[in-house]
From Swiss-Prot:
The lineage of its organism: Bacteria, Bacillati, Bacillota, Bacilli, Bacillales. GO terms for molecular function: damaged DNA binding; DNA-directed DNA polymerase activity; magnesium ion binding. Belongs to the DNA polymerase type-Y family. The record marks F15 as: Substrate discrimination. Monomer. It comes from Staphylococcus epidermidis (strain ATCC 12228 / FDA PCI 1200). This is DNA polymerase IV. Its main location: cytoplasm. It is an enzyme of class 2 (transferase). It comes from the Bacteria.
Amino acid sequence: MTERRIIHIDMDYFFAQVEMRDNPKLKGKPVIVGGKASHRGVVSTASYEARAYGVHSAMPMTQAHKLCPNGYYVTSRFDTYREVSGQIMKIFRSYTELVEPMSLDEAYLDITHLVRPDLPASTIANYIRRDIYEVTRLTASAGVSYNKFLAKLASGMNKPNGLTVIDYNNVHEILMQLDIGDFPGVGKASKKKMHQHHIYTGQDLYNKDEFELIRLFGKRGRGLYNKARGIDHNEVKASRVRKSVGTERTFSTDVNDDDVILRKIRELSGKTAERLNKIQKSGKTVTVKIKTYQYETISKQKSLRDPIRTETDIYNIAYTLYNDLKDPEIPIRLIGVTVGSLEQSDFKNLTIYDFI
């Protein structure tokens, strides 16, 4: 049986990072995102600079103001965060259909079928992180392991912008040294109860037998017993069947130069073809999307008789669609190319070169 390979991707201080990206003056500052203090709001996300003052998520904003009176307080923009999250989830699904989102900024990916001797899971994780940064200009941390519990644990071990692999050769050492409060799923109340029973580390948890843990913690006891041994049989549950594959890019400045835009469409067509290759699909529709300098979004789609998957085929259709959409008088800030109506296709075995 093929050994599972699971990636857990967790965006770094997601809401605050989006705000820093959109307002560069906030970079390096203690940024706190959430509701207004006067409305009894809570902190959604705090930058690492703000965390140094003791500010953390779910903290009342009034308390955050006391801890960090000179912080930069930003009201949450959930429409923006959802839009960016959609871009990130699209990248995940360009690698595998087995994606289980846990929130706007984190997800599990089962990439077992992609792993090859020359293409380890850690390399794929880094390619995903690279793609996220290219599209969103945001960093992400990743954990790689043979089950979901360990992958999530790993993703938090080298933040921000880090990658950690937990495998059979290091899992026992990591778990034994881990503070019990750092085990995923162990909150403040559970930590306090464990301390009452002299459980402070993974080693202490490991030393308790299963029956004692069940006696102390009820049904959760069996799960805790397994966690101390790095055991987790839960599978990645795909949230939906993938219907399209696409890539989009935002220009650094608004553009109305056809040569520049067509070069970008060529690049996006190539990226989309690569992603179709990875998931072994081809498609019968091509869509080109444009966002103008005024943030108006327009798109045009063409349906095909036969499915396509190559860069050349995608580009030729995207070229025509762009020419139908463009207005020489209106600069654009974003261009996207998507292939939809996907169906299974026969592909060669993947190598590392398919991801570069």
